[in-house]
Regions:
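Short Gly/Pro-enriched turn/cap motifs at secondary-structure boundaries
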Residues: 2-4, 84-86, 113
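Active-site-adjacent beta-strand/loop module that shapes the phosphate/pyrophosphate-binding cleft
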Residues: 75-108, 122
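Conserved N-terminal beta-strand and adjoining loop/helix that marks the start
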Residues: 1-21, 40-43, 91-96
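Conserved Nudix-box catalytic region and its N-terminal flanking loop in Nudix hydrolases
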Residues: 20-61
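Short, charged/polar surface micro-motifs in flexible loops or helix N-caps
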Residues: 15-20, 29-30, 42-43, 72-77, ...
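A short coil-to-beta-strand element that immediately follows conserved catalytic motifs
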Residues: 62-72
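Short connector loops at helix/strand junctions that flank enzyme active sites
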Residues: 7, 29, 36, 48, ...
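Nudix hydrolase/Nudix homology domain
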Residues: 31-34, 101-166
Length: 166
């Protein structure tokens, strides 16, 4: 699969000082997913500009201190973005974002959030992720194992590489 058909994206591993992770719940006809906040990089943006914009739109987090990349993820699936561009998946770079816990107050309206399939925010502990028995999926599926390494060993010197096909 050509990387020319993969949408570039960024996400934030937004963690409070107790190692809880802020995730957003995306709901689709085929199921719901807990994912890290973020999204596609606009043509005129670099990674940092895109991540600041996405965090503001989806969570209301302003002037976030963005740290090192913690993983890169390639996800193969069919996607049509808001501009009508068709993609065969996306490549995501996930950056560490340490912050005080806050109550999400997205800059996007409820209507704009729903248009992006975003329905909920939640701070998750690693223990809650591991104990979760609901129908929703975490993305990436094994996020808890990556978080365990980050919490116990620190940010990796070289970002994890994650590949997934739907």
């Amino acid at each position: 699969m050509s990387s020319l058909h993969l949408r570039p994206a960024v996400r934030g591993l937004v963690m409070d000082h107790e190692d809880h992770v802020l995730m957003v719940r995306l709901v689709f006809p085929h199921g719901a997913f807990w994912v890290l906040p973020g999204g596609g990089i606009d043509q005129d943006e670099d990674h940092m500009e895109a991540l600041h914009r996405e965090l503001l739109e989806e969570t209301g987090l302003v002037n976030a201190t963005i740290g090192a990349p913690v993983w890169n993820r390639t996800h193969h699936f069919q996607l049509t973005d808001g501009n009508g561009t068709e993609w065969r998946g996306q490549t995501e770079t996930v950056y560490m974002v340490r912050t005080e816990r806050f109550t999400p107050a997205p800059s996007f309206s409820e209507e704009e959030l729903r248009a992006e399939n975003l329905h909920e925010h939640r701070w998750w502990s690693l223990a809650d992720m591991l104990a979760y028995e609901g129908d929703d999926n975490f993305t990436p599926r094994d996020i808890a194992s990556y978080l365990h390494v980050i919490v116990n060993e620190g940010i990796p010197a070289v970002p994890f590489e994650i590949e997934h096909s739907s």
